[in-house]
C-alpha cells in the first residue's frame, strides 16, 4: 500500500479518493494521539492551530480536522484563511503543540491537502508522519464530558503575522512601486497590507478569491499577467505568490522574470554584507542554476546542495544551523524569521534590499548570470538502471567534458513513476538543447521498458 503522506503532507482531489471529510477527521484524531502526547504527559490539554487557504473545499476539510482534534481532547484555535507560513509562525508564537494547514499550495482549486506542523512551527519528520499513518489503523479511544477539546476562533491571528513581518524589515519601502499578484489565494489582503504599511506604493492583482479561482492563470506559476501589470503601471517591481504564499517569484521593471535562484543570490549577498549569512553558506537544491553557484563562488559564498524539495533544504539548514536556503521555484527559508518557506517574507526582504541600496531589482539580480537550462522528461523507462548503464554513463562523461566549466548535466530518476529527468545547462541555449536531446534519446534507447 503506498504511503499516505507525500513530500508535503496529504494531497489530492477534494472529495476524491484521498481527501475526504472522513479521512480529515480520522487523520486529525491520529495526529492528536501522536503530536499531543507531550502535552498529555505534562498533565495539560494539547493546543493546536488550524488554518486554510481560500479553496471552497477548505471549509469542510478544516471543520472535519477541527472536529477530529476536539473530539480527541485538543483545544483548537481556528485561524481561518491565512498563508501556510503564517500558520507555522503562529504555532511558535502561540506556543501551540502542533498545527494543521489545509491547502494544496500551487495546485488548482479542486485539489486540497492536509499538512501538519510540529511544535515550534516545524515540518514533521518522516518518523512522525509514519506514526500518524500507523495510528489510523488502531482503535480510537476518545475522551468524554469535560475532557473533550474546545474550538475557538483565533481572533488576532492575521494581526500577529502582519506585525511579525513588519518587524523583520530593516528599511522602510518608501518610494518603491510594487505590483503584488496574490494568486486569489491566502496572501490576499495580508500582503498588500504589509507592503502598504511599510511605505510602498502598492498595485494589486489576483486579490479577489472566490474559492474556485485560486492559482487560475495568476500567481507564481503564471507570471505573464504580473509582467503586463508591471509594465502597464510603470512599476519598479512585481511579486507573485502561489495559493498558500509559501513561495514567491518576481518581475523586474523591464518585465523580466526573477526566479528563486536569483532572489537567493540577492538575499545571500545582502545577508553576507551584514554578517548574517551563517558560515557564508547558502543551501540550495541540485536543480539550482549553475549561475547561482558561480555567482556565489565569486563572492566567497559556499553553496551546499541538497536533493530536490524544500523539506531537504530545511533539513540541511537545521542540521548545519544555516541562515538561508531555497529552491529555484521560489521557496526560500530565512531562518532568522521563519521555520518554513514564506513568500511574503521573501518578497518584503527583496523590496527591503532595493530600498537599502537604492538599486533596481534588475541591477541587483545582475550579480548572477542565468545559464540556459533545458529539461526533458523521458517516460516509460527503467529508472532503477539509470546509474548502471555503461553506455549512458560514457555519453554523459563525453558531454560533461565538452561543456567543461560552462555547463553541467543532471540525470534524476522520478520517485513516483517510470521516468528519468534529463537536465542540461550550457553557456547557450542551442548547446543545452543539443546535449539534452541526444541524452534523452539515448535514455529511451537504453532504458525503455
Swiss-Prot record:
Any single GO BP term: carbohydrate metabolic process
Annotated positions binding Mg(2+): 105, 242, 244, 246
Catalytic residues (UniProt): 105 (phosphoserine intermediate)
Name of the molecule in the record: Phosphoglucosamine mutase
Post-translational modification: Activated by phosphorylation.
Residues modified to Phosphoserine: 105
InterPro entries recorded: A-D-PHexomutase_a/b/a-I (IPR005844), A-D-PHexomutase_a/b/a-I/II/III (IPR016055), A-D-PHexomutase_a/b/a-II (IPR005845), A-D-PHexomutase_a/b/a-III (IPR005846), A-D-PHexomutase_C (IPR005843), A-D-PHexomutase_C_sf (IPR036900), A-D-PHexomutase_CS (IPR016066), Alpha-D-phosphohexomutase_SF (IPR005841)
Enzyme class, broadest EC rank: isomerase
Functional summary from the UniProt entry: Catalyzes the conversion of glucosamine-6-phosphate to glucosamine-1-phosphate.
A molecular-function term among this protein's GO annotations: magnesium ion binding
Protein family per UniProt: Belongs to the phosphohexose mutase family.
GO cellular component: cytosol
Gene name linked to the record: glmM
SUPFAM superfamilies: Phosphoglucomutase, C-terminal domain, Phosphoglucomutase, first 3 domains
Listed Pfam families: PGM_PMM_I, PGM_PMM_II, PGM_PMM_III, PGM_PMM_IV
Free-text comment on the cofactor: Binds 1 Mg(2+) ion per subunit.
Swiss-Prot/TrEMBL catalytic activity: alpha-D-glucosamine 1-phosphate = D-glucosamine 6-phosphate
E.C. number(s) listed in UniProt: 5.4.2.10
Amino acid at each position: 500500500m503506498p504511503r499516505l503522506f507525500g513530500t508535503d503532507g496529504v494531497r489530492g482531489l477534494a472529495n476524491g479518493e484521498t481527501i475526504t471529510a472522513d479521512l480529515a477527521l480520522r487523520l486529525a484524531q491520529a495526529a492528536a494521539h501522536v503530536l499531543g502526547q507531550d502535552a498529555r504527559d505534562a498533565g495539560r490539554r494539547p493546543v493546536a492551530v488550524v488554518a486554510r487557504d481560500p479553496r471552497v473545499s477548505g471549509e469542510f476539510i478544516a471543520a472535519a480536522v477541527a472536529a477530529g482534534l476536539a473530539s480527541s481532547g485538543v483545544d483548537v484555535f481556528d485561524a481561518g484563511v491565512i498563508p501556510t507560513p503564517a500558520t507555522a509562525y503562529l504555532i511558535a508564537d502561540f506556543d501551540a503543540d502542533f498545527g494543521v494547514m489545509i491547502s494544496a499550495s500551487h495546485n488548482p482549486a479542486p485539489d486540497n491537502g492536509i499538512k501538519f506542523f510540529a511544535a515550534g512551527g516545524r515540518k514533521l519528520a518522516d518518523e512522525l508522519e509514519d506514526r500518524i499513518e500507523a495510528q489510523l489503523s488502531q482503535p480510537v479511544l476518545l475522551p468524554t464530558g469535560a475532557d473533550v477539546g474546545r474550538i475557538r476562533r483565533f481572533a488576532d491571528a492575521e494581526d500577529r503575522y502582519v506585525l511579525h513581518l513588519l518587524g523583520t524589515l530593516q528599511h522602510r519601502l518608501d518610494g518603491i512601486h510594487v505590483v503584488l499578484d496574490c494568486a486569489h489565494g491566502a496572501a490576499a489582503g495580508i500582503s498588500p497590507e504589509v507592503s502598504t504599511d511599510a511605505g510602498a506604493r502598492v498595485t494589486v492583482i489576483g486579490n479577489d478569491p472566490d474559492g474556485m479561482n485560486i492559482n487560475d492563470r495568476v500567481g507564481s506559476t503564471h507570471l505573464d499577467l504580473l509582467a503586463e501589470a508591471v509594465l502597464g503601471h510603470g512599476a519598479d517591481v512585481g511579486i507573485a505568490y502561489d495559493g498558500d504564499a509559501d513561495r514567491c517569484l518576481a518581475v523586474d521593471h523591464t518585465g523580466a522574470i526573477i526566479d528563486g535562484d536569483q532572489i537567493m543570490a540577492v538575499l545571500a549577498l545582502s545577508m553576507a554584507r551584514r554578517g548574517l549569512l551563517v558560515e557564508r553558506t547558502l543551501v540550495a537544491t541540485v536543480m539550482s542554476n549553475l549561475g547561482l553557484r558561480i555567482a556565489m563562488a565569486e563572492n566567497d559564498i559556499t553553496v551546499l546542495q541538497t536533493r530536490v524539495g524544500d523539506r531537504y533544504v530545511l533539513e540541511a539548514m537545521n542540521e548545519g544551523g544555516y541562515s538561508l536556503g531555497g529552491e529555484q521555484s521560489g521557496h526560500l527559508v530565512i531562518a532568522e524569521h521563519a521555520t518554513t518557506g514564506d513568500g511574503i517574507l521573501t518578497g518584503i526582504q527583496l523590496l527591503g534590499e532595493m530600498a537599502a541600496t537604492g538599486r533596481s531589482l534588475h541591477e541587483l539580480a545582475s550579480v548572477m548570470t542565468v545559464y540556459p537550462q533545458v529539461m526533458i522528461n523521458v517516460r516509460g523507462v527503467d529508472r532503477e538502471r539509470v546509474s548502471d548503464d555503461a553506455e549512458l554513463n560514457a555519453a554523459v562523461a563525453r558531454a560533461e567534458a565538452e561543456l567543461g566549466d560552462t555547463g553541467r548535466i543532471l540525470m534524476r530518476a522520478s520517485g513516483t513513476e517510470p521516468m528519468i529527468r534529463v537536465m542540461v545547462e550550457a553557456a547557450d541555449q542551442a548547446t543545452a538543447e543539443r546535449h539534452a536531446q541526444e541524452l534523452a534519446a539515448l535514455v529511451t534507447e537504453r532504458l525503455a521498458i
